[in-house]
């Protein structure tokens, strides 16, 4: 899929991986890049505009933990501005197993709520045009870092939720896939802690192993968006992009 003249809404598009991905996106000659983030970063917005002045870049403050009704209200404003949204990227995430409720609220519940809100506009059963959802998971979603089970569990939930969305595409008209970064050098990794402090040096230990830069991750992130494969589970690790084959151990029969 060519991203030329597409309208993209990027939740958490100013974070570590998020900002590098936004830089790559504007190089693709989007029509609009709408960034929703908790904290404004005027310098980053100015930089993105300078990379490609032809792309209209808009920022709205957004906390993914707000109720669905508030998200729907914000999306209504965005749709009024850009008319159509082609791609939604759900990228909000924290890695803090000391904050159990907030980790789940940001990493999973917020993603589900944002998705639920945009379906109000996209769902073909309501006359919507459909759309594409790219959810940011993590390699911990299919193989946990056991010292951070809350974070890992929240990312496993993202993978399963997104796989369900993909299978619902014939009903809703909305396709979906996950991009799942491996250990990437960002402030998120440097600051994170373990559940109940079972491993006080968990961040330090992880960084002793091979990692990738956020730029490497961002380049493959955008490649995955361009490939636009419904139901894909992409692994973005050590500068590579690889599809993961999910093994089915049970079938609901419905």
UniProtKB/Swiss-Prot annotation:
GO cellular component, one term: cytosol
Alphabetically ordered keywords of this record: NAD, Oxidoreductase
Domain of life: Eukaryota
Binding site for substrate: 138
Documented EC number(s): 1.1.1.1
Molecular function terms from GO: alcohol dehydrogenase (NAD+) activity
InterPro entries, per database record: ADH_Drosophila-type, NAD(P)-bd_dom_sf, Sc_DH/Rdtase_CS, SDR_fam
Catalytic residues of the enzyme: 151
Catalytic activity: a primary alcohol + NAD(+) = an aldehyde + NADH + H(+); a secondary alcohol + NAD(+) = a ketone + NADH + H(+)
UniProt xrefs under Pfam families: adh_short
GO biological process: alcohol metabolic process
Enzyme class: oxidoreductase
Binding site for NAD(+): 10-33
Subunit and interaction comment: Homodimer.
Family of the protein in this entry: Belongs to the short-chain dehydrogenases/reductases (SDR) family.
Protein name in the entry: Alcohol dehydrogenase
């Amino acid at each position: 899929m060519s991203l030329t003249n597409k309208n993209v809404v990027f939740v958490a598009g100013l974070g570590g991986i998020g900002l590098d991905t936004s830089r790559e996106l504007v190089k693709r000659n989007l029509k609009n890049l709408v960034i929703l983030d908790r904290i404004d970063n005027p310098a980053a917005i100015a930089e993105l505009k300078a990379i490609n002045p032809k792309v209209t870049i808009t920022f709205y403050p957004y906390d993914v933990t707000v109720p669905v009704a508030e998200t729907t209200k914000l999306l209504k404003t965005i749709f009024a501005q850009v008319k159509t949204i082609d791609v939604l990227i759900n990228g909000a995430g924290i890695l803090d197993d000391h904050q159990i409720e907030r980790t789940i609220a940001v990493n999973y519940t917020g993603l589900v709520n944002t998705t639920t809100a945009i379906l109000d506009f996209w769902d073909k059963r309501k006359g919507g045009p459909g759309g594409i959802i790219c959810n940011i998971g993590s390699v911990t979603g299919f193989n946990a870092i056991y010292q951070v089970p809350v974070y890992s569990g929240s990312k496993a939930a993202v993978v399963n939720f997104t796989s369900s969305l993909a299978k619902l595409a014939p009903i809703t008209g909305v396709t979906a896939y996950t991009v799942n970064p491996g250990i990437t050098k960002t402030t998120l990794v440097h600051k994170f802690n373990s559940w109940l402090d079972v491993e006080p040096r968990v961040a330090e230990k992880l960084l002793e192993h091979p990692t990738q830069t956020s730029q490497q991750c961002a380049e493959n992130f955008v490649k995955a968006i361009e490939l636009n494969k419904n139901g894909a589970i992409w692994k973005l690790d050590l500068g590579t992009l690889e599809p993961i084959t999910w093994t089915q151990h049970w079938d609901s029969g419905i």
